From Swiss-Prot:
The gene is RPS21. Component of the small ribosomal subunit. Mature ribosomes consist of a small (40S) and a large (60S) subunit. The 40S subunit contains about 33 different proteins and 1 molecule of RNA (18S). The 60S subunit contains about 49 different proteins and 3 molecules of RNA (25S, 5.8S and 5S). The keyword Zinc does not apply. One of its GO terms (molecular function) is structural constituent of ribosome. InterPro entries: Ribosomal_eS21 (IPR001931), Ribosomal_eS21_CS (IPR018279), Ribosomal_eS21_sf (IPR038579). The lineage of its organism: Eukaryota, Fungi, Dikarya, Ascomycota, Saccharomycotina. One of its GO terms (biological process) is translation. This is Small ribosomal subunit protein eS21.
């Protein structure tokens, strides 16, 4: 919802699970949001540049969070030499 100035005024903005594209509900207390910083050649974090993944409690409860995070990071080019059964 927006006010007359066009500013967002809602208290809750729903997120989607990065692995399943399901909406993460407000009462899903098992969900996590993980931010991975991009780094320069010296290994220092670049300010303001990061990649964020949201994982729902459903994915974490099934024990698929680590595989999902590896798959998402491979798609974004963060991991290159991780074993995958699909290769």
């Amino acid at each position: 919802m927006e006010n007359d100035k066009g500013q967002l005024v809602e208290l809750y903005v729903p997120r989607k699970c990065s692995a399943t594209n399901r909406i993460i509900k407000a009462k899903d207390h098992a969900s996590v949001q993980i931010s991975i910083a991009k780094v320069d050649e010296d290994g220092r974090a670049i300010a303001g540049e990061n990649i964020t993944y949201a994982l729902s409690g459903y994915v974490r409860g099934r024990g698929e969070a680590d595989d999902s995070l590896n798959r998402l990071a491979q798609q974004d080019g963060l991991l290159k030499n991780v074993w995958s059964y699909s290769r």
